[in-house]
From Swiss-Prot:
Its EC number is 2.4.1.32. The chain crosses the membrane at residues 50-70, 382-402, 418-438, 494-514, 515-535. This is Probable glucomannan 4-beta-mannosyltransferase 15. One of its GO terms (cellular component) is Golgi membrane. Keywords: Cell wall biogenesis/degradation, Glycosyltransferase, Golgi apparatus, Membrane, Transferase, Transmembrane, Transmembrane helix. One of its GO terms (biological process) is cell wall organization. It comes from Arabidopsis thaliana (Mouse-ear cress). It comes from the Eukaryota. InterPro entries: Glyco_trans_2-like (IPR001173), Nucleotide-diphossugar_trans (IPR029044). The active site is at D150, D303.
Length: 537
């Protein structure tokens, strides 16, 4: 602030001379001189007594958090290394035997499986998901496909209904279900689907979002885990992305999600038999779901809500890293921002509602409760977002104006470098994009922080649900053109952050000596590019 006032104060002599000429007096000049000196003194005292000590305290907190994040990242990757070195794949840890048809019973030894496909105005992808579900290699008399259509567009409703009729004519047991309203969004649709009488005969439930395409042998590989291990409630597959090469933004998403599955899901499954259900590409044991109370629509992360409640009952989860399901990444920046808002707001709101329930739980050991509260929720779903945004996008840039505050190199270079490398190894083919990925993740941390705050304090958008826009098979579908009108493309939050960091970079370039401007110029560019809408397709 003083630096901004200094140029103005330096002009006061000129103004005073003019005033002296006009009023022929020296008293006014002396008064204004005194005011300028007093303002300068007050600012220096405020800066030294309040601002600098407060900033130092914030930096210390950030350093502690950076160590916690570092330890968590190293721990998860050590678990992944352990799985690889000692071949601790789920097939080796849990009993698994391939499904075989009984000569006497025929298909009767196959359990009844319900496949749910929730959708909402999914014109581009509904054929892909319905077709993939109907092609699953499972006895047709032991499989029920349920299409839960919440579409509001009559034309799309008709298309989805016709697609279901087409597969029904091929002796596929498929049911097209609609409801009168969209209460509860996806959770409400799933809950409504479970009320139908034919569902009661099913033992297992497989869920696929409208853009997911399971391979034909998906059930053959997943169901045996549930059949031969009665303590297991969930088998989760990883996602494989059909449009990862569409643009740079989808490559960045692929890197983030690959790390999520490789490190977070695999370590949770290996060490604690618990992780967050990804909402799709998973198979549930119906008994476990019913025991936990089924689907609830109190948050926008009904999948995580169900997983936590089932896990607190003592059920185990299995993540199968080499069981992949094709899916689509949002390729438009607006759609991606809405998705990230939901994925950050929902968990924060859920931990607000479930903290005491987890603490008072008597069914699981204290270490598992600690893992769920600290690692699963607090560190990964809340603290990481705040830390990434405030430390790398606010604290570091602002520190150039406060040379008295020393931020050690290990916190700005060594620790983030190790964390970045550990994250990047999940997607070796994109290793050369790691710098772009870090800068983009910092930009998105701003939106995730905002979503987390809304979830924690139940702000106005806490239950906002915007269905992620899909484009279908990007190899055969023309990409939607970016809106050419600048006002509709501009994102003011990103622009403001970019301008602020750019100012900090310029100041550090002119007066600093730590070369922090090298990072600040790159981060400012990332914010500004996002701000003018040149991200995605």
């Amino acid at each position: 602030m003083f630096l901004l006032l200094k140029p103005l104060l330096s002009l006061h002599d000129l103004s005073l001379n003019l005033l002296s000429v006009m009023f022929h007096g020296e008293t006014l000049k002396a008064s204004v001189d005194g005011v300028g000196i007093n303002m300068s003194t007050m600012w220096r005292e405020t800066r030294n007594v309040f601002i600098v000590p407060l900033f130092k305290c914030i930096v210390v907190m950030c350093l502690i958090i950076s160590l916690l994040v570092f330890v968590e990242s190293v721990y998860m990757n050590l678990v992944v290394l352990y799985v690889k070195l000692f071949n601790r794949k789920p097939e080796k840890v849990y009993k698994w035997e391939a499904m075989q048809e009984d000569m006497e019973l025929g298909h009767q030894n196959y359990p009844m499986v319900l496949v749910q496909i929730p959708m909402y105005n999914e014109r581009e992808v509904f054929e892909l998901s319905i077709g993939a579900a109907c092609r699953l290699t499972w006895p047709s008399d032991r499989l029920i496909v349920q299409v839960l259509d919440d579409s509001t567009d009559p034309a799309i409703m008709e298309l989805v209904s016709m697609e279901c009729t087409k597969w029904a004519s091929k002796d596929i047991n498929i049911n097209y279900e609609r409801r009168e309203n969209r209460n509860g969004y996806k959770a409400g649709a799933l809950k409504h689907g479970m009320r139908h009488s034919y569902v009661k005969q099913c033992q297992y439930l497989a869920i696929f979002d409208a853009d997911f395409q399971p391979e034909p042998d998906y059930l053959q590989r997943a169901i045996p885990f549930l059949i031969h291990n009665p303590e297991v409630a969930l088998v989760q597959a990883r996602w494989r992305f059909v449009n990862a090469n569409t643009c740079l933004m989808t490559r960045m998403q692929e890197m983030s999600l690959n790390y999520h599955f490789m490190a977070e899901q695999q370590s949770g499954s290996t060490r604690h038999a618990f992780f967050g259900f990804n909402g799709t590409a998973g198979v549930w044991r119906m008994v476990a779901m019913e025991e936990a109370g089924g689907w609830k629509d109190r948050t926008t992360v009904e999948d995580m809500d169900l997983a936590v409640r089932v896990g607190l009952l003592g059920w185990k989860f299995i993540f199968v890293n080499d069981l992949e399901v094709k899916s689509e990444l949002p390729s438009q920046f607006k759609a991606f921002r809405f998705q990230q808002h939901r994925w950050s707001c929902g968990p924060a709101n859920l931990i607000r509602k479930m903290t005491m329930e987890i603490i008072h739980n008597k069914r699981v050991k204290i270490w598992k409760k600690f893992y769920v509260i600290y690692s699963f929720f607090f560190l990964r779903k809340i603290v990481v977002h705040f830390f990434t945004y405030f430390f790398y996008c606010v604290i570091l840039p602002t520190s150039v104006f406060l040379p008295e505050v020393n931020i050690p190199n290990w916190s700005t270079i060594y620790v983030p470098s190790v964390i970045t490398l550990l994250s990047a190894i999940a997607t070796p083919r994109s290793f050369y994009l790691v710098i772009f990925w870090v800068l983009f993740e910092n930009v998105m941390a701003m939106h995730r922080t905002k979503g987390t705050l809304i979830g924690l304090f139940e702000g106005g958008r806490v239950n906002e649900w915007v269905v992620t826009e899909k484009l279908g098979d990007t190899l055969n579908t023309k990409l939607l053109p970016q809106n050419g009108r600048l006002p509709k493309r501009v994102n003011l939050k990103e622009m403001m952050m970019g301008i602020y960091i750019l100012c900090c970079a310029c100041y550090d370039f002119a007066f600093g000596n730590a070369f922090l401007y090298l990072y600040l110029f790159m981060q400012a560019t990332a914010f500004l590019i996002s701000g003018v809408g040149f991200v995605g397709t």
